[in-house]
Amino acid sequence: MQLKQNFLSSFIVILILLIAPPANAQSQNDLIDHIIKEKFRIGSSQVFTNEDSPISKNGKAESKLTNNSAADEAEPFIIVNPNDSSHLLISYINLDLASEIFNFPIYYSNDSGQTWNKSSFDTQEFYLDDPFPGFEIAGGGDPIFAFDNDGNIYFTWLYLAANFSNFETRFVVLWGQSSDGGATWGIQEGDKKYLETGGLDLFTGGTNEFGTGVFDRPWFDSDRSGGPHDGNLYCTGLFIPSTTLAMDTTVEQTAGMVLKRKLPSVDSFETSRTQISNGDLAQFGNIKVANNGTIHVVYGNINDQEVRYSTSIDGGLSFEPPSTIGQFSFDIMSTIILVNDRENPALSMALDYSNNNTYIVWNSIDDRVSGLYTYSQDEGVTWKDVQDIATLSGMPDHQVYLPNIASNDNNEVSISWYSLDSLDVGNYMIMHSRDGGKNWETPISLSDAVTDFSEYIVTNPQQQPPIFGDYFTSVKVGCTTYSVWSDGRDMNGPKIYVSANNFCNVLSNTSEITAITEDIQLRSVYPNPSKHILYLEYNLKKQSDISVSIYNTDGKLVQSYLTESIPAGTQTRSYDIHSIIPAAYTILINSEFGTITRKIIKQ
């Protein structure tokens, strides 16, 4: 494996030399270069190691998804079942170069994140069962979910494969479907399993003759309106046609931001694409389908540095001419890294399905990384003035890195982001609005330790920096916002963390988290409220050393208990809390399988 790593390192150097940016306007080749640098993965597990650095906990109640210490974890996506708010799914990039692992694990919960199960589906095993001869997985990303009204779940991901003997590549976007809540996944046979296939010509900086073309940054949503297009599954993305397709005069040519459709009861995506952008360089798209069936799409126009927005009311067969709703700075040819090598406009869109209010946030990269926000209260006809997220948060001197936005059906909106100082150090934050995004409450820190992005800068051209990903995501269910992000606090490479904030709860500045694992479950915390004794009921698949601590709402430790080795099975333990004063607290349970937190009341 070390030989492959060295070869890959040299391969990246060759890529940089082959696709050197020209000294003129940004072009399609520059965009392809940007895609190559994003999708090719070398990994960081052998570059950054510091296993002696403990992860401190101070009661903020955020937690790592897994007990993984070797792999990079990045680009997390979280979704909730629109017809069952207790049903959640998460996936992310999981890259462990030493173990030759590059997959997208799927975790699902049927109890609002109290317990988690891992799907049996392995994207890498599936791909390797039916590979392109002579091609190995060299990168990929973009794990995305969507639900339909019948409870079916759709999943898409992409792989970049390479033949290292001749520099040929394959760029394939795959999709699957689950009808059992995410436990198992069905994949179509033959070419039906591909949403799009293409390849990159590493010597010209364009596409090659394979397939139909490159389809990057796929984003899913489905029509759940009950209208004439109910059940349609839509996917937006950047499309660059293959050289073969580009020369085919018998088909309508599309390029830039496009939409692909899968109709209900059809087992494949249509081969056609609907043009959204006006032939411009377009990337970083998001799609949402409103409760009336209107399709909302937002993307970045690279050359004009504009946030563009468009809608479709005919099921994605056509789109209105895009309108400009904001600006950003982003030079895809720049070699200057401000925070992380994957900094990008990172557009994120949310809808309030009760009134179809539309909210959008994004990054602008100039001499610092800024976060911007706008919203529409008339289904995208007009937009409010763009606002600076750092200013809204009360921290105008801070950078806002990779913001994302979520909304419920009650005029409540949340924005999550990395708030970084001038040295690129900071916490992952969230702030909340209860009046449709007009006014914002004081931000809350979701992470209980800072990430120092400056420590992850790589100067050796034969190494890639650790993978944090191109975006993070969040979803809002009633009062609760679930946020997932890639956290680099322990200098052992980025790891996925998740937090759940209930903005209706009296403990509005804390979260409840359950580690995403099948090895430990906290079945019950009782009585709650409690005066003297608190009981915790565990279910363990195997023995574990468990430590329990209690923190106040300021994050200060008020009570800790001796670490106890608890055997496998269902076990109940009691904890004396008579000495702490009556108030609201967070109890934190640490195990080798992850961390669990719960809110408690001492009477």
Task: Pin down the residues of each PLM region.
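Residue-level detector of alpha-helical transmembrane segments in integral membrane proteins
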Residues: I14-L15, E136, I520-L522
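Extreme N-terminus of proteins, especially the signal/transit-peptide cleavage junction
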Residues: E51-N58, A515-I520, K541
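N-terminal secretory signal peptides that target proteins for export/translocation
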Residues: M1-F7
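Low-complexity, intrinsically disordered segments with a bias for serine/threonine
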Residues: V13-I14, G437, L534
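Bacterial N-terminal signal peptides
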Residues: S9-A20
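C-terminal PAP-associated
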Residues: Q26-S508
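C-terminal outer-membrane/trafficking sorting elements
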Residues: Q2, P21-A25, T517-Y526, S530-Q603
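Low-complexity, Pro/Thr/Ser/Gly/Ala-rich linker/spacer regions in secreted
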Residues: F503-D519
